[in-house]
């Protein structure tokens, strides 16, 4: 009897321990702001002052390897080496669906920014920025919130891969505005207001850097923003010029649109947003599929669950909280790239040209933004171990790029050929995936592309200048 009772007590203890372990939130160990301040090392001070001395990371809300990185914005630009957010900055200008190459010194692209304000209408990013305190920020992979002090607005953000939902509590509800910018540094953006559908829609054309610097990448970042409340005023702007009652504006830097909501009491306003690299219909379908409701807390819980599952793939056996924060924070930052590039229906722009639209295989994502010179040594081998199916999809995406563009890419970013670094690191990633037993990609076609890169060079200098072929290979 005693042995039976002891056995039952042991079983109960183990069960309780398992339950306790399962209930531990690993998100608790991740502060997404880590890496947004400058490094204190001597080497960082010598190299990349004001750019690469930073970790160039983001305090983003995202799905692991999702399309959009939903981030607060303190820097109004998509310029090279300028991340959307830095810890040292004192004002928040809005909330962006960023496609920043996290950890690098390249560019953001195809993004838009939205910002709630109240009182006097301030619409330019440099004018409307609000003071905030890091002590009043909550920054996790599934949820971000901050008090915008200048407007007494409590802003909250959560989302999914291609879409987000915002909850803005206007504590001073009179003159409650929403501002939206297509972030086109080249002055090629477009934005429109649809008061019937209660939407703001627009696009931001993507351009290249490195090979083909400044040239169009052949596609746009489309976005849709939806609101519930009635509005009392709307309009557009271009720099210092305000156009009240105008519904659309295009082709210029510093353009955007604004709404003034009809609210007369304190309380939250819900805003939904989504994007696509194919077209406006794709953005709408992404939003309708991922967040078909107006339940902020439901979406937050969905994303919480996704991240708990992601972080729980590795168990850190230590009671040292600092070690857990380092590890799970690093795993978060290892979950940005490559990004999902296709819509929920599988469509995406052709590699290198943008057209025609392609269709990914059923159940398979097409991935983009391989900062391969930085990631082939450690990130991709980690992906191969933790998520082999996803790793195979990433390798198939490289094969797709070879078939669509004619050459296996070296450093594919913004869905274009680039060759900023010498070497041929995609070959290393493909080889490591194969050695680790990953087979859910076209092995023969991958080998064909690898051999072509190794033994042939582009027929023309224009192709080589465009980023095709291996760098410094004798013809």
What spans do the regions from the language model cover?
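Bacterial Sec-dependent N-terminal signal peptides
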Residues: 1-23
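Accessory carbohydrate-recognition regions in carbohydrate-active enzymes
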Residues: 21-475
């Amino acid at each position: 009897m005693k042995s039976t009772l002891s056995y039952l007590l042991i079983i109960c203890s183990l069960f309780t321990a398992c339950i306790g372990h399962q209930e531990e939130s690993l998100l608790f160990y991740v502060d997404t702001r880590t890496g947004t301040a400058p490094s204190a090392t001597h080497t960082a001070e010598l190299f990349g002052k004001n750019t690469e001395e930073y970790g160039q990371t983001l305090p983003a809300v995202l799905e692991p390897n999702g399309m959009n990185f939903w981030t607060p914005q303190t820097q109004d630009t998509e310029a090279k080496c300028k991340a959307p957010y830095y810890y040292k900055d004192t004002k928040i200008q809005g909330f962006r669906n960023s496609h920043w190459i996290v950890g690098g010194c390249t560019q953001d692209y195809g993004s838009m920014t939205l910002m709630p304000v109240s009182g006097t209408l301030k619409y330019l990013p440099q004018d409307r920025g609000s003071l905030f305190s890091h002590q009043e920020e909550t920054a996790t992979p599934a949820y971000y919130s901050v008090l915008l002090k200048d407007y007494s607005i409590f802003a909250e953000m959560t989302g999914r891969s291609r879409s987000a939902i915002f909850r803005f509590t206007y504590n001073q509800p009179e003159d409650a505005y929403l501002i939206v910018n297509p972030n086109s540094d080249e002055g090629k953006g477009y934005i429109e207001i649809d008061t019937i559908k209660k939407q703001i829609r627009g696009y931001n054309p993507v351009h290249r850097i490195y090979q083909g610097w400044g040239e169009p990448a052949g596609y746009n970042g489309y976005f849709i923003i939806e609101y519930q409340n009635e509005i009392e005023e709307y309009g557009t702007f271009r720099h210092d010029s305000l156009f009240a009652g105008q519904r659309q504006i295009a082709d210029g830097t510093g353009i955007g649109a604004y709404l003034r909501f009809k609210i007369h009491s304190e309380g939250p306003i819900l805003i939904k947003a989504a994007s696509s690299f194919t077209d406006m219909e794709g953005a709408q379908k992404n939003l309708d599929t991922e967040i078909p409701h107006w339940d902020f807390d439901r979406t937050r819980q969905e994303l919480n669950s996704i991240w708990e599952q992601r972080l729980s793939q590795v168990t850190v056996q230590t009671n040292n909280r600092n070690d857990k924060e380092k590890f799970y924070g690093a795993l978060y930052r290892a979950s940005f790239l490559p990004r999902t590039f296709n819509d929920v229906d599988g469509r995406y722009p052709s590699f290198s040209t943008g057209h025609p639209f392609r269709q990914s295989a059923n159940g398979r994502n097409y991935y983009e933004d391989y900062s391969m010179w930085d990631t082939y040594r450690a990130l991709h081998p980690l992906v191969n171990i933790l998520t082999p199916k996803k790793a195979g999809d990433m390798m198939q995406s490289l094969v797709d790029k070879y078939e669509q563009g004619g050459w296996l890419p070296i450093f594919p970013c913004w869905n274009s050929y680039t060759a900023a670094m010498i070497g041929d690191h995609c070959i290393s990633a493909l080889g490591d995936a194969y050695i680790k037993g990953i087979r859910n990609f076209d092995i023969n076609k991958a080998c064909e592309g690898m051999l072509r890169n190794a033994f042939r060079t582009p027929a023309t200098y224009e192709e080589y200048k465009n980023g095709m072929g291996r760098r410094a290979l004798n013809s």
